[in-house]
């Protein structure tokens, strides 16, 4: 993994990003631990939340830039690729010279390289934007080394001791955290995503023809090459 990341960071037309979803946040008057300078009344039992939000993060390690997407629906394969596409739309003019994205991921249930809908959506992304995407997965029990994980710890410390009793409050705290002196760019995602979407075996075989898997490590390193 270090070799892949170092090579990406040293290549002028390649941009490396780290992507992951944080644990779902319950919206409501719930105690979250931590300390507050003001007296805050919280519920003494975790009743049904008023809403939930799952932060999806995209982090650019070499630039120390962070992007958060507050998802109010299920974080599915479609959701993750939609966040990736939304992010690219906001930065593509800055990175017009970039031809390859190297994406650091953990091997989660919605984004692993055998997840048929995830791979189909990434193939569509590559075709649409004419970018090569290289997926570089951290092995089991090593996701803590994914750079985005360090950002989640900062966010958690930032809002501990606070009642996250509305979606606006969650977004406000996400916007005011800092990483190396910079605030993240934060977006709210209200689209509804269905779970369980998958391809047929025959359809996935067609997708596999667009994938280049590293021999012996095919689950962990996958290239989706842009069309010529």
Regions found by a protein language model. Name each.
Residues 5, 21-25, 60-62, 107-109, ...:
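Short, flexible loop/turn elements at secondary-structure junctions
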Residues 118-136:
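Two-metal-ion acidic nuclease core segments, chiefly of the RNase H-like superfamily
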Residues 105-118, 139-145:
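Acidic, metal-coordinating catalytic cores used for nucleic-acid/nucleotide bond scission
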Residues 1-41:
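Charge-mixed, compositionally biased segments that are often intrinsically disordered regulatory tracts
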